[in-house]
């Protein structure tokens, strides 16, 4: 890769040109006369440090270009007469095989589209070649590339880039945006210089690199005051780049140093882009006035003393953070010559993990916390408004905590600018529960502004842990500008049920709140894991424990009531993994309850897209960049991760990143689908028992033989709702319950797994004993949890094996408490929910004794599709089963599977045939092992050697000696020792059961 000087060719083309020295370095001297096209990869400079624009382009040689330079057409960099461009570009030869474009969509000027639409396809192609210089077989086009300003742009194609060929299907579409995007607001010839100018104000996403500053600035310049505009604003104000200007909005005013933005960039022409320090001052204003001042840098005087106050927040109010904050505050003013005035805001970032052990010798790592200070007073010998802080002269002191509204992240993404730990953004369309939380908090803000205190309190609850309740609260609070007081109740648990323990717990919570609540206006008091300190007094085993539990519950209820009514703009939010364990007295104080479910497929897709964004992926490791390959289908990844929580997804992304460290390429770690699939499989295997994560089994229809009729019935029941859900949108109930019954060993479990594999459904197997629990009510709760996990992992199959042990006829059981009857009743209720609101969840049961099942299970809407899986009654069906079981065997040539089937009785089940084939393979292996021993002994005798068997395998044996070939005699030997698992009498019994159920 070469850093080349960037030159503009002042032409419009789809090819670039290289200077002779670069051409020779890339392609040699012989390539000048070569007729084959050459291509390069360009990486354009970008103000977005996480997203660099890379283009593949055809290139030619230009002897007139200066040494070490590359000439780019104006349509590549959107250059105009008044817009300066970057001075350099990264360039390298592209030596890989370029893909051909199968299809291409071009957006055209509407007038041009109307003209071309009257031409034939061949005439359209000729026009594109003549007018836009698109050479078929040579030109490379990239998605979003401007082919000709104001007339033509690439909208989409079969690949991100590729060669335009004669076989490329070109689709032309009209698009007025092509014209609008080409218009440049900065192309002026004559205008009057303005003293002030109204513009929009926006926050920079990332700090601008020092090499992008024009003119260059000393290292000690206050970079927080850097502001950036397009050149048209500088021209209208009549000031050069690097000039100090005033930014004014109503009573707010600030001094900034104005710099020009180089092309190419995606910034707006009528906006001022500033750092979070400046944006915080003007956070309530969308537009500001830029005014030319009569001010020079050398007129700033050095202040003698500056007094700062702390902006109230939970971190700034805690003593344990003061040493590390003071250290970074001193660094902030010593590293740069900061220019301040009274009322300015000062941002300080630090690593909170080092707070408890911080010393001046420790250099903290990755910053994760931001606090703010306000300039209260400046002592100086001059009367100037703005002063420089010189760390060797100016005396700094901090005083009180002051109140100020927090800047919402919707206005300024300060986490990204300061490279703090990123917070997931909840899209309201994909996450309805996040939208509801935002709506409630916004309503609380509006009521507070009108002096109406509604005492808002919210409970976030879920049926599974680690679904992101804390992440949701932090994200929404940051987006809306709420201060957050977070207390994790897991750290407050106490083993002693005493009044003193209750007082300490409540006192600790109140102390956390009281230190800051007086200094903030919009605040959320967030208590997570409430169920760890709150207990229902009725569930206690003695009066003392019941009394202590009631005392804690009353104190917590009073705390919620007090802070939400006494302090305006205060919202209480609690979280729990089991809403039923929250005592009634506390729950009565909660006005809103929001269920936070396990992410759906759409929500998981949003999370994977966010986690694999270059900024999020590399924010903690900026020196070693990771990128996700373009061919990774995140939609498929979201399907494979069904049932996983946000914490699991975050762990998967981290593991994927570490897994691909070994494939280092150009300082970028390229993540591909193989890495992601491997990590997801490992995560599922590791956590399946603890989190109950369902899997997609690996059983195909080829593994099953002799069930063609049953397969057709299954396709009608399951395939139809999945492929055509619109047919059931009118209110028609789908059939989601299937019952397999028949003799044991006929493939009921295997068939259920094949269903899940064939339709890419997650598979959730439930055994009867694991539902039973000694505590009253827990067995029914286990049934509810099973169906809830299936809904979280949909599309999903719940498979109840040996259903007769789970749901026997009610009233016939002798168990105390009637637990089996209650399990059946709960199962019936859940099955009724499947037919109405359980889209994507299918229930399959398997039993050998359908006559023992509760009759209510077999009614319509539940297990209403009963399929008998019997024993194969023809030689052909038996041969199909043997063929499926032996498809991975090496059979002797000439062996006929039908001949094997003819020797088998008609009471062999599928399990019996499995035993037959397994024993035949074992017989073959035993036979081959004996033959190998004979060959080894014979070799030693003939050669008068005493070599080991291992040496014989490694050096003497050939491929045929190692191959296990199953012969007919192996099957005959296996059949002699095989006893059918179902007798003739039992088979007749199952046939009578079949006829009785089919006649109902």
UniProtKB/Swiss-Prot annotation:
InterPro entries: AAA+_ATPase, AAA_ATPase_domain, ATPase_AAA_core, ATPase_AAA_CS, P-loop_NTPase, PEX6_4th_dom, RecA-like_PEX6_r2. It is found in: Cytoplasm, Cytosol; Peroxisome membrane. It is a peripheral membrane protein. SUPFAM superfamilies: P-loop containing nucleoside triphosphate hydrolases. GO terms for biological process: protein import into peroxisome matrix. One of its GO terms (cellular component) is cytosol. Interacts with PEX1; forming the PEX1-PEX6 AAA ATPase complex, which is composed of a heterohexamer formed by a trimer of PEX1-PEX6 dimers. This is Peroxisomal ATPase PEX6. Its main location: cytoplasm. It comes from Kluyveromyces lactis (strain ATCC 8585 / CBS 2359 / DSM 70799 / NBRC 1267 / NRRL Y-1140 / WM37) (Yeast).
């Amino acid at each position: 890769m070469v850093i080349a000087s960037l030159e503009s060719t002042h032409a419009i083309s789809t090819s670039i040109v290289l200077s002779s020295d670069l051409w020779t370095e890339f392609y040699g001297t012989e390539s000048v006369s070569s007729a084959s096209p050459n291509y390069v990869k360009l990486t354009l400079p970008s103000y977005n440090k996480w997203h660099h624009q890379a283009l593949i382009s055809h290139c030619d040689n230009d002897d007139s270009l200066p040494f070490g330079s590359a000439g780019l057409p104006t349509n590549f960099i959107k250059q105009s007469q008044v817009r300066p461009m970057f001075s350099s570009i990264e360039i390298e030869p592209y030596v890989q095989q370029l893909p051909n474009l199968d299809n291409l969509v071009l957006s055209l000027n509407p007038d041009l589209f109307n003209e071309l639409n009257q031409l034939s396809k061949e005439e359209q192609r000729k026009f594109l070649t003549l007018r836009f210089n698109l050479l078929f077989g040579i030109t490379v086009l990239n998605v979003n590339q401007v082919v000709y300003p104001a007339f033509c742009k690439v909208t989409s194609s079969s690949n991100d880039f590729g060669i335009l060929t004669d076989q490329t299907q070109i689709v032309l579409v009209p698009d007025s945006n092509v014209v609008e995007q080409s218009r440049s607001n900065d192309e002026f010839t004559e205008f009057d210089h303005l003293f002030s100018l109204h513009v929009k104000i926006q926050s920079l996403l990332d700090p601008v690199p020092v090499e992008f500053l024009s003119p260059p600035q000393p290292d000690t310049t206050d970079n927080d005051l850097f502001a950036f505009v397009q050149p048209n604003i500088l021209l209208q104000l009549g000031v050069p780049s690097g000039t100090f200007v005033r930014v004014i909005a109503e009573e707010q005013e600030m001094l900034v140093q104005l710099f020009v933005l180089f092309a190419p960039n995606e910034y707006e022409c009528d906006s001022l882009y500033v750092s979070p320090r400046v944006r915080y001052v003007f956070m309530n204003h969308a537009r500001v006035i830029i005014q030319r001042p009569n001010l020079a840098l050398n007129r700033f005087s050095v202040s003698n003393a500056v007094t700062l106050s702390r902006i109230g927040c939970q971190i700034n109010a805690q003593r344990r953070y003061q040493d590390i904050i003071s250290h970074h505050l001193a660094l902030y003013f010593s590293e740069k010559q900061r220019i301040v005035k009274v009322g300015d805001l000062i941002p300080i970032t630090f690593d909170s993990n080092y707070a408890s052990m911080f010393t001046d010798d420790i250099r903290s790592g990755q910053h994760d916390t931001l606090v703010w200070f306000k300039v209260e007073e400046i002592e100086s010998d001059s009367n100037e408004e703005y002063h420089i802080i010189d760390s060797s002269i100016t005396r700094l002191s901090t005083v009180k905590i002051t109140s100020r509204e927090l800047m919402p992240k919707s206005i300024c993404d300060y986490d990204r600018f300061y490279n703090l730990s990123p917070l997931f953004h909840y899209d309201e369309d994909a996450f309805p529960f996040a939208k509801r939380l935002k709506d409630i908090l916004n309503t609380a803000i509006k009521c507070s502004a009108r002096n109406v205190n509604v005492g808002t309190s919210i409970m976030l609850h879920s049926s599974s842990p680690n679904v992101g309740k804390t992440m949701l609260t932090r994200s929404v609070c940051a987006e809306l500008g709420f201060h957050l007081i977070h207390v994790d109740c897991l750290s407050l648990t106490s083993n002693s049920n005493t009044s003193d323990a209750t007082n300490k717990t409540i006192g600790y919570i109140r102390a956390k709140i009281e230190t800051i609540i007086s200094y903030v206006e919009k605040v959320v008091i967030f208590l997570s894991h409430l169920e760890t300190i709150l207990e229902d007094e009725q569930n206690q085993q003695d009066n003392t424990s019941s009394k202590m539990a009631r005392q804690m519950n009353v104190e917590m209820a009073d705390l919620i009531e007090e802070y939400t009514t006494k302090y305006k703009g205060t919202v209480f939010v609690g979280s729990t993994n089991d809403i039923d364990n929250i005592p009634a007295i506390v729950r009565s104080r909660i006005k809103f309850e929001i269920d936070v479910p396990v992410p759906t497929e759409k929500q998981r897709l949003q999370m994977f897209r966010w986690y694999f964004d270059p900024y999020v992926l590399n924010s903690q490791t900026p020196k070693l960049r990771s990128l996700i390959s373009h061919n990774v289908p995140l939609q498929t990844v979201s399907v494979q991760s069904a049932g996983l929580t946000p914490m699991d997804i975050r762990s998967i992304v981290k593991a994927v990143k570490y897994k691909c460290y070994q494939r280092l390429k150009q300082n970028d770690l390229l993540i591909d689908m193989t890495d992601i699939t491997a990590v997801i499989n490992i995560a599922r295997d590791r956590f399946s028992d603890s989190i109950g994560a369902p899997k997609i089994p690996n059983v195909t229809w080829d593994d099953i033989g002799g069930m063609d009729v049953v397969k057709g019935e299954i396709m009608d029941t399951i395939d139809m709702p999945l492929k055509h859900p619109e047919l059931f949108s009118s209110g028609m109930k789908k059939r989601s319950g299937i019952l397999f019954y028949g003799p044991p060993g006929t493939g009921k479990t295997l068939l259920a797994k094949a269903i899940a594999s064939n339709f890419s459904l997650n598979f959730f197997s439930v055994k009867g004993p694991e539902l039973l629990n000694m505590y009253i009510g827990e067995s029914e709760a286990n049934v509810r949890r099973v169906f809830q996990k299936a809904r979280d992992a949909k599309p999903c199959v719940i498979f109840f094996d040996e259903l007769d042990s789970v749901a026997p006829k009610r009233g016939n059981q002798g168990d105390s408490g009637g637990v089996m009857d209650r399990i059946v009743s709960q199962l019936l209720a859940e099955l009724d929910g499947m037919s109405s609101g359980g889209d994507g969840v299918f229930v399959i049961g398997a039993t050998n004794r359908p006559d023992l099942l509760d009759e209510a299970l077999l009614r319509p809407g539940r297990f209403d599709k009963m399929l008998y899986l019997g024993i194969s009654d023809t030689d052909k069906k038996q041969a199909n089963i043997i063929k499926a079981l032996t498809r991975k065997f090496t059979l002797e040539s000439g062996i006929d599977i039908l001949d094997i089937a003819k020797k088998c009785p008609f009471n062999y089940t599928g399990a019996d045939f499995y035993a037959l084939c397994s024993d035949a393979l074992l017989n073959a292996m035993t036979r081959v092992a004996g033959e190998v021993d004979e060959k080894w002994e014979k070799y030693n005798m003939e050669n008068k050697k005493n070599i080991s068997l291992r040496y014989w395998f490694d050096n003497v044996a050939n491929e045929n000696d190692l191959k296990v070939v199953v012969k007919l005699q192996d099957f005959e030997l296996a059949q002699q020792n095989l006893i059918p698992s179902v007798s003739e009498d039992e088979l007749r019994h199952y046939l009578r059961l079949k006829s009785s159920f089919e006649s109902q």
